[in-house]
Amino acid sequence: MPKKILFTGGGTVGHVTLNLILIPKFIKDGWEVHYIGDKNGIEHTEIEKSGLDVTFHAIATGKLRRYFSWQNLADVFKVALGLLQSLFIIAKLRPQALFSKGGFVSVPPVVAAKLLGKPVFIHESDRSMGLANKIAYKFATTMYTTFEQEDQLSKVKHLGAVTKVFKDANQMPESTQLEAVKEYFSRDLKTLLFIGGSAGAHVFNQFISDHPELKQRYNIINITGDPHLNELSSHLYRVDYVTDLYQPLMAMADLVVTRGGSNTLFELLAMAKLHLIVPLGKEASRGDQLENATYFEKRGYAKQLQEPDLTLHNFDQAMADLFEHQADYEATMLATKEIQSPDFFYDLLRADISSAIKEK
């Protein structure tokens, strides 16, 4: 019988990306892959879109909140139901291990796997642990982290960032769509790419709409998340969502304006791409993006601008500073030791799974 591995994680793209990097490697090596998540969540959408040979198992999910809400009462029952469903799924599948990328949907499968004696491996991308992973850590065999953790946690392995970006633009697939975009852009202007992510695109969209003069100073690429804004015109390309075109657009840009999500930041670091970070504040997140942005700025990888300070004047000043010191930023990024290849992590995870199985 083939070996089986169970993945979980969802709620945002960032809680799915690493799973989608690892899954094809397990499939190639003959593993049977299953995924537990929310059928209405982005994890189901991304798995379906990938076309990978993965069996998806839907469970009830409840959001984990750090504040009082009457919804917490209803969500207690949803989480309990999700735990029972996870116990049934895992008992039936009998996988060799579970790998979790975090998000509130991941807690019931992690707890269930531990209760059934299955090795549990989890991954934390941010500078500090989210609530879901704080809970999951108690049940984990090993936690892999992108950042070094300040707390001395016995089950943590500092990994660095796992990303599969193309460092060489010549490796990227040719795109007729990209060539069409270039027809509308000026070679005399710098090209800026705005990436807001699933939670933070609106502010960038509004900033670009409110300041049409930006198009006179730069070529603008705006990944909006909103198909109603799609547009290709002089010095402006607005698109709601990209997949195969994502990295070619990153390579095409002279500078990327991004939120503070860990996955995107480390992709930019791996590409040594000049970038400005406008992190989500504590009113829109738990503060993890502020921590990530501060870390990147202190390391000399990037410059940050707080969302309340995102005015045209401040933006132009940030652009001028970044381009003036571009060589310094790029040299610092090229010298980083914080990037790991997917193959490196896959081999490490496989070895840790084997060790955990032998120790049972």
Curated annotation (Swiss-Prot):
Pfam families: Glyco_tran_28_C, Glyco_transf_28. Pathway: Cell wall biogenesis; peptidoglycan biosynthesis. Cell wall formation. Catalyzes the transfer of a GlcNAc subunit on undecaprenyl-pyrophosphoryl-MurNAc-pentapeptide (lipid intermediate I) to form undecaprenyl-pyrophosphoryl-MurNAc-(pentapeptide)GlcNAc (lipid intermediate II). It is found in: Cell membrane. SUPFAM superfamilies: UDP-Glycosyltransferase/glycogen phosphorylase. Its EC number is 2.4.1.227. Its main location: membrane. It comes from the Bacteria. It is a peripheral membrane protein. Belongs to the glycosyltransferase 28 family. MurG subfamily. One of its GO terms (molecular function) is undecaprenyldiphospho-muramoylpentapeptide beta-N-acetylglucosaminyltransferase activity. UDP-N-acetyl-alpha-D-glucosamine binds at S198, Q289. InterPro entries: GlcNAc_MurG, Glyco_trans_28_C, GlycoTrans_28_N. The keyword RNA-binding does not apply. Keywords: Cell cycle, Cell division, Cell membrane, Cell shape, Cell wall biogenesis/degradation, Glycosyltransferase, Membrane, Peptidoglycan synthesis, Transferase. One of its GO terms (cellular component) is plasma membrane. It catalyses: Mur2Ac(oyl-L-Ala-gamma-D-Glu-L-Lys-D-Ala-D-Ala)-di-trans,octa-cis-undecaprenyl diphosphate + UDP-N-acetyl-alpha-D-glucosamine = beta-D-GlcNAc-(1->4)-Mur2Ac(oyl-L-Ala-gamma-D-Glu-L-Lys-D-Ala-D-Ala)-di-trans,octa-cis-undecaprenyl diphosphate + UDP + H(+). This is UDP-N-acetylglucosamine--N-acetylmuramyl-(pentapeptide) pyrophosphoryl-undecaprenol N-acetylglucosamine transferase. GO terms for biological process: carbohydrate metabolic process; cell division; cell wall organization; lipid glycosylation; peptidoglycan biosynthetic process; regulation of cell shape.
